[in-house]
Amino acid sequence: MGLFDFLSGRKRPKSGVVAVSSDKLEAAILALNRDTAPYQITKCDDGSCDLVAEWKIVDAKWYEIFGKAGLKKAFKVKMRLDVEKSEVRAVDMDYTVSWRAGVPELELHASGFRGQKSEISFGTAYAFSEELEFGQVYNYRFNSAEIKKPLQQAVTDNGWTWRGVAFGKL
């Protein structure tokens, strides 16, 4: 592993590990799905990638005094399998949307990210739920390593190289 591998997020398989077929690699990545995992890995259906791992971190709505508000936050890892190079190119994407509608205001905030990201975050909020009961409306804990490390391990264990993409084509 070279210096630039560390900086770029490239993970190479151990020497002597033979690369499996793309079908076997895809099956190994999809096998990471489990009921207890906070994320889901699926085949990409829009053609922008081969596989996508998505963690829906927060999706909450609540009532405030004279208004309603909400927060939605998600993190995705899109992956493209390059059979010729036995390489998986991956890009991290996240988005956050928060909104508030009340008297006399209407407010919307949205942000997004594309590249390579390492994040640890957490949050909680108490308010009136949509059932008009006071309590916790969201509580989340997020660590991007929990989704990326198993993916990288599955790729390198099967003889392929993991390459993080920040600016280039996936």
List the predicted regions and their residue ranges.
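A composition-biased, non-transmembrane "mature-region" signal
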Residues: 1-170
